[in-house]
Regions:
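Active-site/substrate-binding loop(s) of hydrolase catalytic cores
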Residues: 49, 63-210, 279
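C-terminal accessory segments enriched in acidic
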Residues: 1-9, 14, 18, 22, ...
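Soluble metallo-hydrolase cores and metallopeptidase-like ectodomains found primarily
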Residues: 3-52
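Short beta-strand element of the alpha/beta-hydrolase
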Residues: 51-59
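Short glycine/proline-enriched loop/turn "hinge" motifs that connect secondary-structure elements
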Residues: 44-46, 140-143, 268-274
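Conserved hydrophobic/aromatic pocket- or pore-lining residues that grip, position, or stack substrates
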Residues: 37, 57, 103
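A generic structural signal for alpha->beta connector loops
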Residues: 23-25, 39, 98-100, 147, ...
Length: 319
Protein backbone atom coordinates (compact mmCIF):
# COMPACT_ATOMS: atom_id res chain seq x y z
CA UNK A 1 0.00 0.00 0.00
CA UNK A 2 1.18 3.53 -0.72
CA UNK A 3 2.67 5.30 2.29
CA UNK A 4 1.69 8.87 2.96
CA UNK A 5 4.86 10.27 4.52
CA UNK A 6 6.68 12.63 2.14
CA UNK A 7 10.28 13.82 1.96
CA UNK A 8 11.28 17.27 3.14
CA UNK A 9 11.75 18.40 -0.46
CA UNK A 10 8.31 17.19 -1.51
CA UNK A 11 6.63 18.89 1.47
CA UNK A 12 8.52 22.12 0.74
CA UNK A 13 7.55 22.20 -2.93
CA UNK A 14 3.95 21.23 -2.15
CA UNK A 15 3.65 24.46 -0.15
CA UNK A 16 5.42 26.48 -2.84
CA UNK A 17 3.13 25.04 -5.52
CA UNK A 18 0.00 25.82 -3.47
CA UNK A 19 1.03 29.46 -3.23
CA UNK A 20 1.50 29.60 -6.99
CA UNK A 21 -1.82 27.94 -7.73
CA UNK A 22 -3.86 30.10 -5.31
CA UNK A 23 -1.78 33.26 -5.46
CA UNK A 24 -4.70 35.64 -4.81
CA UNK A 25 -5.09 34.47 -1.20
CA UNK A 26 -2.13 32.15 -0.42
CA UNK A 27 1.43 33.32 0.23
CA UNK A 28 4.62 31.29 0.60
CA UNK A 29 7.42 32.50 2.84
CA UNK A 30 10.71 31.12 4.15
CA UNK A 31 11.02 32.13 7.80
CA UNK A 32 14.55 30.87 8.39
CA UNK A 33 16.85 27.91 7.94
CA UNK A 34 18.10 25.00 9.99
CA UNK A 35 21.68 24.51 11.17
CA UNK A 36 22.23 22.19 8.20
CA UNK A 37 20.87 24.93 5.90
CA UNK A 38 17.44 23.48 5.11
CA UNK A 39 14.86 26.21 4.64
CA UNK A 40 11.82 26.39 6.95
CA UNK A 41 8.69 27.17 4.89
CA UNK A 42 5.47 28.84 5.99
CA UNK A 43 2.18 29.12 4.11
CA UNK A 44 -0.29 31.95 4.76
CA UNK A 45 -3.90 31.22 3.76
CA UNK A 46 -6.59 33.89 3.67
CA UNK A 47 -6.75 37.67 3.79
CA UNK A 48 -7.41 38.20 7.49
CA UNK A 49 -5.54 41.00 9.21
CA UNK A 50 -4.63 38.83 12.20
CA UNK A 51 -3.20 35.31 12.15
CA UNK A 52 -3.50 31.91 13.80
CA UNK A 53 -0.31 29.83 13.76
CA UNK A 54 -0.40 26.09 13.05
CA UNK A 55 2.97 24.53 13.93
CA UNK A 56 4.18 21.00 13.27
CA UNK A 57 7.14 18.69 13.77
CA UNK A 58 9.49 20.42 16.19
CA UNK A 59 10.36 16.83 17.10
CA UNK A 60 11.97 14.99 14.20
CA UNK A 61 10.11 11.81 15.14
CA UNK A 62 6.83 13.53 14.27
CA UNK A 63 6.70 12.11 10.76
CA UNK A 64 2.91 12.32 10.34
CA UNK A 65 1.99 15.86 11.40
CA UNK A 66 3.80 17.63 8.50
CA UNK A 67 1.81 15.59 5.97
CA UNK A 68 -1.43 16.30 7.81
CA UNK A 69 -0.82 20.05 7.92
CA UNK A 70 0.11 20.20 4.23
CA UNK A 71 -2.92 18.09 3.30
CA UNK A 72 -5.10 20.32 5.49
CA UNK A 73 -3.70 23.45 3.81
CA UNK A 74 -4.58 21.99 0.40
CA UNK A 75 -8.16 21.35 1.52
CA UNK A 76 -8.51 24.85 2.95
CA UNK A 77 -7.18 26.48 -0.23
CA UNK A 78 -9.50 24.50 -2.48
CA UNK A 79 -12.53 25.20 -0.26
CA UNK A 80 -11.64 28.91 -0.06
CA UNK A 81 -11.42 29.25 -3.85
CA UNK A 82 -14.69 27.36 -4.43
CA UNK A 83 -16.59 29.02 -1.57
CA UNK A 84 -17.35 25.67 0.05
CA UNK A 85 -18.50 24.99 3.61
CA UNK A 86 -16.48 22.46 5.59
CA UNK A 87 -18.55 19.96 7.58
CA UNK A 88 -21.61 21.84 6.24
CA UNK A 89 -20.91 24.60 8.76
CA UNK A 90 -17.53 26.35 8.52
CA UNK A 91 -17.40 29.03 5.82
CA UNK A 92 -13.70 28.81 4.97
CA UNK A 93 -13.52 32.06 3.02
CA UNK A 94 -15.38 34.07 5.65
CA UNK A 95 -13.30 32.69 8.52
CA UNK A 96 -9.89 33.03 6.85
CA UNK A 97 -10.69 36.56 5.73
CA UNK A 98 -11.11 37.41 9.43
CA UNK A 99 -8.07 35.54 10.76
CA UNK A 100 -5.69 34.01 8.23
CA UNK A 101 -3.73 30.84 8.91
CA UNK A 102 0.06 30.69 9.08
CA UNK A 103 0.94 27.03 8.59
CA UNK A 104 4.48 25.92 9.52
CA UNK A 105 4.31 22.15 8.97
CA UNK A 106 8.00 21.32 9.36
CA UNK A 107 9.91 23.37 11.93
CA UNK A 108 12.73 20.83 12.34
CA UNK A 109 13.64 19.71 8.81
CA UNK A 110 17.03 18.28 9.84
CA UNK A 111 15.52 16.05 12.53
CA UNK A 112 12.73 15.00 10.19
CA UNK A 113 15.21 13.85 7.54
CA UNK A 114 17.50 12.16 10.09
CA UNK A 115 14.61 10.09 11.41
CA UNK A 116 13.74 8.99 7.86
CA UNK A 117 17.16 8.39 6.30
CA UNK A 118 19.80 8.37 9.03
CA UNK A 119 22.61 10.70 10.07
CA UNK A 120 24.25 10.58 6.63
CA UNK A 121 21.70 13.15 5.36
CA UNK A 122 23.43 15.84 7.44
CA UNK A 123 25.79 17.67 5.09
CA UNK A 124 27.90 19.42 7.74
CA UNK A 125 30.66 16.88 8.55
CA UNK A 126 31.19 18.15 12.10
CA UNK A 127 27.51 17.90 13.01
CA UNK A 128 27.25 14.51 11.29
CA UNK A 129 30.14 13.04 13.26
CA UNK A 130 28.88 14.49 16.56
CA UNK A 131 25.47 12.93 15.99
CA UNK A 132 26.93 9.51 15.22
CA UNK A 133 28.95 9.64 18.45
CA UNK A 134 25.75 9.96 20.49
CA UNK A 135 24.89 6.33 19.67
CA UNK A 136 21.16 7.01 19.40
CA UNK A 137 19.28 5.08 16.68
CA UNK A 138 18.24 7.53 13.97
CA UNK A 139 14.60 6.41 14.14
CA UNK A 140 14.54 7.45 17.81
CA UNK A 141 16.25 10.79 17.19
CA UNK A 142 14.02 13.85 17.56
CA UNK A 143 16.57 16.68 17.86
CA UNK A 144 18.08 18.99 15.24
CA UNK A 145 21.43 18.66 13.44
CA UNK A 146 23.29 19.93 16.53
CA UNK A 147 21.58 17.34 18.73
CA UNK A 148 19.42 19.94 20.52
CA UNK A 149 15.82 19.36 21.57
CA UNK A 150 13.97 22.26 19.94
CA UNK A 151 10.85 21.79 22.03
CA UNK A 152 12.91 22.68 25.14
CA UNK A 153 14.85 25.60 23.66
CA UNK A 154 12.42 28.53 23.95
CA UNK A 155 13.18 31.23 26.58
CA UNK A 156 10.25 30.54 28.90
CA UNK A 157 9.97 31.02 32.62
CA UNK A 158 11.54 28.03 34.32
CA UNK A 159 13.89 27.34 31.40
CA UNK A 160 16.58 24.85 32.37
CA UNK A 161 19.78 24.17 30.53
CA UNK A 162 20.10 20.44 29.94
CA UNK A 163 23.50 20.20 28.23
CA UNK A 164 26.67 22.14 27.44
CA UNK A 165 26.40 24.59 24.57
CA UNK A 166 22.68 24.99 25.00
CA UNK A 167 21.06 28.23 26.06
CA UNK A 168 17.60 29.67 25.54
CA UNK A 169 16.95 30.27 21.83
CA UNK A 170 20.39 28.94 20.89
CA UNK A 171 19.09 27.12 17.81
CA UNK A 172 18.42 28.58 14.36
CA UNK A 173 15.04 26.91 14.06
CA UNK A 174 13.85 28.35 17.36
CA UNK A 175 15.18 31.80 16.46
CA UNK A 176 13.17 31.67 13.22
CA UNK A 177 9.96 30.84 15.10
CA UNK A 178 10.56 33.53 17.71
CA UNK A 179 11.07 36.13 14.97
CA UNK A 180 7.83 35.24 13.21
CA UNK A 181 5.88 35.11 16.50
CA UNK A 182 7.18 38.55 17.42
CA UNK A 183 6.57 39.98 13.95
CA UNK A 184 3.00 38.73 13.55
CA UNK A 185 1.95 38.34 17.21
CA UNK A 186 -1.30 36.70 16.12
CA UNK A 187 -4.44 35.53 17.87
CA UNK A 188 -3.21 32.10 18.89
CA UNK A 189 -0.99 29.07 18.32
CA UNK A 190 -2.00 25.48 17.64
CA UNK A 191 1.01 23.18 17.95
CA UNK A 192 0.53 19.68 16.51
CA UNK A 193 2.36 16.55 17.63
CA UNK A 194 1.95 12.80 17.88
CA UNK A 195 1.94 10.51 20.95
CA UNK A 196 -1.03 10.94 23.29
CA UNK A 197 -4.50 11.75 21.96
CA UNK A 198 -5.16 14.95 23.87
CA UNK A 199 -5.47 18.73 23.79
CA UNK A 200 -3.23 20.63 26.21
CA UNK A 201 -3.73 24.15 27.50
CA UNK A 202 -1.34 26.06 29.72
CA UNK A 203 -1.27 27.97 32.98
CA UNK A 204 1.59 29.98 34.41
CA UNK A 205 2.73 33.53 33.67
CA UNK A 206 -0.71 34.68 32.51
CA UNK A 207 -3.68 36.04 34.41
CA UNK A 208 -6.83 34.18 35.35
CA UNK A 209 -8.87 35.62 32.50
CA UNK A 210 -6.33 34.41 29.95
CA UNK A 211 -6.29 30.96 31.53
CA UNK A 212 -10.09 30.90 31.33
CA UNK A 213 -9.98 31.85 27.64
CA UNK A 214 -7.42 29.14 26.88
CA UNK A 215 -9.50 26.55 28.70
CA UNK A 216 -12.70 27.66 26.98
CA UNK A 217 -11.21 27.43 23.49
CA UNK A 218 -9.55 24.09 24.30
CA UNK A 219 -12.90 22.79 25.52
CA UNK A 220 -14.61 23.98 22.33
CA UNK A 221 -12.04 22.12 20.25
CA UNK A 222 -12.47 18.99 22.34
CA UNK A 223 -16.24 19.12 21.86
CA UNK A 224 -15.70 19.30 18.09
CA UNK A 225 -13.61 16.13 18.22
CA UNK A 226 -16.24 14.53 20.48
CA UNK A 227 -18.97 15.07 17.90
CA UNK A 228 -16.88 13.41 15.23
CA UNK A 229 -15.83 10.67 17.69
CA UNK A 230 -19.46 9.70 18.38
CA UNK A 231 -20.05 9.14 14.68
CA UNK A 232 -16.87 7.07 14.33
CA UNK A 233 -17.63 5.00 17.44
CA UNK A 234 -21.08 4.21 16.13
CA UNK A 235 -19.53 3.06 12.86
CA UNK A 236 -16.59 1.10 14.30
CA UNK A 237 -17.61 0.17 17.84
CA UNK A 238 -14.24 1.45 19.14
CA UNK A 239 -13.68 4.07 21.83
CA UNK A 240 -12.02 7.18 20.43
CA UNK A 241 -11.61 10.85 21.21
CA UNK A 242 -9.31 13.50 22.64
CA UNK A 243 -9.11 14.33 26.30
CA UNK A 244 -8.41 17.75 27.76
CA UNK A 245 -5.36 18.31 29.94
CA UNK A 246 -4.02 21.31 31.83
CA UNK A 247 -0.27 21.91 31.94
CA UNK A 248 1.65 24.22 34.24
CA UNK A 249 4.44 26.20 32.60
CA UNK A 250 6.77 25.20 35.42
CA UNK A 251 6.74 21.54 36.46
CA UNK A 252 8.28 20.83 39.90
CA UNK A 253 11.45 18.74 39.83
CA UNK A 254 9.82 15.93 41.80
CA UNK A 255 6.84 15.69 39.46
CA UNK A 256 6.84 13.73 36.23
CA UNK A 257 5.12 15.10 33.15
CA UNK A 258 4.60 13.43 29.79
CA UNK A 259 5.20 16.77 28.12
CA UNK A 260 7.61 18.93 30.09
CA UNK A 261 6.73 22.53 29.33
CA UNK A 262 9.76 24.59 30.42
CA UNK A 263 11.34 25.77 27.16
CA UNK A 264 8.35 24.70 25.05
CA UNK A 265 6.93 26.91 22.26
CA UNK A 266 3.36 27.05 23.58
CA UNK A 267 4.04 28.75 26.94
CA UNK A 268 6.60 31.02 25.26
CA UNK A 269 4.05 32.21 22.70
CA UNK A 270 1.49 32.68 25.45
CA UNK A 271 3.91 34.77 27.50
CA UNK A 272 4.84 37.18 24.69
CA UNK A 273 1.36 37.62 23.18
CA UNK A 274 -1.10 36.94 26.02
CA UNK A 275 -3.01 34.79 23.50
CA UNK A 276 -3.99 31.12 23.83
CA UNK A 277 -1.50 28.47 22.77
CA UNK A 278 -2.68 24.87 22.62
CA UNK A 279 -0.90 21.62 21.87
CA UNK A 280 -2.88 19.02 19.94
CA UNK A 281 -1.53 15.47 19.98
CA UNK A 282 -3.11 13.23 17.37
CA UNK A 283 -2.63 9.87 19.09
CA UNK A 284 -0.22 8.23 16.64
CA UNK A 285 2.96 6.63 17.94
CA UNK A 286 6.40 7.69 16.70
CA UNK A 287 7.56 5.54 13.83
CA UNK A 288 4.01 4.75 12.75
CA UNK A 289 3.38 5.15 9.03
CA UNK A 290 0.03 5.87 7.43
CA UNK A 291 -1.41 5.01 4.05
CA UNK A 292 -2.95 7.80 2.00
CA UNK A 293 -6.39 6.66 3.12
CA UNK A 294 -5.36 6.71 6.79
CA UNK A 295 -3.78 10.15 6.36
CA UNK A 296 -6.99 11.46 4.83
CA UNK A 297 -9.03 10.08 7.72
CA UNK A 298 -6.64 11.53 10.31
CA UNK A 299 -6.78 14.92 8.57
CA UNK A 300 -10.57 14.88 8.69
CA UNK A 301 -10.34 14.35 12.45
CA UNK A 302 -8.41 17.57 13.06
CA UNK A 303 -9.03 19.86 10.08
CA UNK A 304 -11.96 21.56 11.81
CA UNK A 305 -9.88 22.55 14.85
CA UNK A 306 -8.22 25.69 13.41
CA UNK A 307 -11.59 26.70 11.95
CA UNK A 308 -13.37 26.17 15.27
CA UNK A 309 -10.67 28.24 16.97
CA UNK A 310 -11.25 31.13 14.56
CA UNK A 311 -15.03 30.76 14.79
CA UNK A 312 -14.94 30.78 18.61
CA UNK A 313 -12.60 33.75 18.66
CA UNK A 314 -14.49 35.91 16.16
CA UNK A 315 -18.08 35.05 17.06
CA UNK A 316 -17.87 36.04 20.72
CA UNK A 317 -18.11 32.49 22.09
CA UNK A 318 -14.87 33.21 23.97
CA UNK A 319 -14.58 36.67 25.48
Amino acid sequence: MEKASDTYEKLYYSLWELAGRYSSFVQFRVIGSSHDERMIPMLEIGKGRNVLFCLGSLDGRDQITPDILVYMAEEYAKAYECGWLLEDFYDIRKLLDQIRLCVIPLANPDGYEICRYGFSVIRNPIYRQMLKMQQIPCEEFGCNARGMDLSRNFPTSGYKRTRAGQGPASENEVKALIRIFQEYQGEGLLSFGQAWQRILYYTGDINGRQIYKSHKIARNLQQCTDRRRVKKEQASGLKMGYHLEKQSVIVPENKESRYFTAGAPEPFYQQITARPALRIEIGKTWGQELTREELSECTRDIRILPLEYIFSYTSGLVS
